[in-house]
A protein has these predicted regions:
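Short beta->alpha linker loops
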Residues: 24-27, 43-47, 67-68, 150-154
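Glycine-rich cofactor phosphate-binding loops and adjacent beta1-alpha1 units
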Residues: 40-109
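Non-catalytic positions within long, well-ordered alpha-helices that form the structural scaffold/packing
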Residues: 33-34, 77, 163
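Mid-domain Rossmann-like dinucleotide-binding core that forms the NAD(H)/NADP(H) cofactor-binding site
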Residues: 1-45
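C-terminal capping/lid region of NAD(P)-dependent oxidoreductase domains
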Residues: 138-148, 156-176
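Local beta-strand N-terminus motif with an aromatic residue
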Residues: 37, 57-61, 142, 155
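C-terminal substrate-binding/catalytic core of Rossmann-like NAD(P)-dependent dehydrogenases/reductases
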Residues: 98-148
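Glycine- and other small-residue-rich loops at beta-strand/loop junctions that grip anionic moieties
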Residues: 21, 41, 62-66, 122, ...
Length: 176
């Protein structure tokens, strides 16, 4: 929800007129609403799957973006509707027979892999995605979510903060 990947994901979905359900801690609720979340689930104090069922009238969600870990991906896959899909950047969920009954699709996202793949088509696709995202930022449809501007010498501290996976928005280093 409140992290960089989730924040961009929410905004892109809203730019495509999707209904967005996200999870975050209570302290970040207003922040994610400002980014476009229609429904916010406090993952620390609410049962995420129960809330998804409540919000979707028992149907489940069409799509899940999992950017945290395998446990979150496993929870996300349970919240999908029949024919839904999950995109994961931080570990794939466990696939069981029950999962296959839902006819879901699972996508492992490795954007950085395009750079090391020596696959020109993958690199071109990544460049086109970046170009489209930048157009959305320039047009004001997507916020760059810069929440912290740090100096070059503070990059190690910024990276330590990112490792906690509790950074809101994006940390940007100012290089003079």
């Amino acid at each position: 929800g409140a992290g960089g990947v989730g924040g961009y994901g929410m905004q892109i979905c809203k730019s495509r007129k999707a209904t967005v359900i996200t999870t975050c801690s209570a302290k970040n609720e207003e922040y994610v609403k400002a980014l476009g979340a229609d429904h916010v689930i406090d993952y620390q104090n609410e049962d995420v799957l129960d809330r998804i069922q409540e919000i979707t009238n028992g149907r489940g969600v069409d799509s899940v973006q999992s950017a945290v870990d395998i446990d979150t991906a496993n929870q996300g896959i349970q919240g999908l509707c029949f024919g839904g899909g999950i995109s994961c950047i931080a570990g794939l969920p466990s696939l069981s027979e029950k999962t296959f009954e839902k006819a879901i699709s699972v996508h492992k996202i490795a954007l950085g892999g395009a750079h090391t793949s020596n696959n020109y088509d993958a690199q071109t696709d990544l460049a086109n995605m970046a170009k489209e995202l930048m157009s959305l930022v320039v047009d004001g449809e997507v916020s760059p979510m810069v929440t912290d501007l740090i100096k070059l010498e503070d990059i190690p501290k910024g990276l330590e903060r990112l490792e906690t996976r509790h950074v809101k928005g994006k940390i940007v280093a100012e290089i003079e």
